[in-house]
């Protein structure tokens, strides 16, 4: 798009599913957030260092262990939290998932998934690395779910929950109650 009146296709890549949101990680990397072929939320890291031959370098599907999943970050970019760092970036994605579990229909689970993008200075080595998840009250993930990151601190605000914890131990995030 260097000449907006004459856009050109310099390269292309066919991938299963689609991306609703593309986020620039670096000049050579793009992060896609969208839907997989199974219609589950997915994060996909694209290496565009060679624009004529972009590649999908890393893929994570959220809620893949159950029958359905969705993320409000697919339609509301403010639901995605992204903290850029020199070597490693951090991001969080809220999502809900559910289905048949042990023959019982249909429990649902609401979560915040935490990821790091590592190796971003060397695009060929960059990866999306799962860090952990914060469990929320079922039915609490919606378009207003937010995460605030401050160094190692982690704060989650949803329709029902207000939690705090640490990036290094997200599973231990606990409810914050006023005194």
Residue ranges and their predicted role:
Residues 1-179:
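Feature marking well-ordered beta-strand scaffolds used for ligand recognition
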């Amino acid at each position: 798009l260097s000449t907006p009146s004459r856009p050109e296709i310099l390269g292309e890549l066919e991938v299963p599913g689609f991306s609703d949101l593309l986020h620039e990680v670096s000049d050579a990397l793009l992060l896609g957030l969208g839907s997989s072929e199974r219609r589950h939320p997915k994060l996909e890291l694209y290496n565009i260092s060679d624009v004529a031959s972009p590649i999908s370098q890393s893929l994570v599907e959220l809620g893949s262990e159950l029958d359905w999943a969705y993320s409000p970050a697919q339609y509301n970019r403010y639901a995605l939290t992204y903290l850029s760092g020199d070597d490693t970036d951090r991001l969080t994605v809220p999502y809900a998932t559910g289905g048949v579990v042990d023959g019982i229909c249909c429990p649902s689970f609401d979560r915040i998934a935490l990821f790091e993008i590592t190796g971003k200075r060397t695009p060929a080595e960059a990866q999306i690395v799962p860090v952990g998840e914060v469990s929320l009250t079922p039915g609490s993930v919606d378009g207003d779910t937010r995460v605030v990151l401050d160094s190692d601190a982690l704060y989650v605000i949803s329709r029902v929950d207000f939690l705090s914890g640490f990036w290094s131990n997200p599973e231990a995030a606990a409810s914050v109650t006023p005194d």
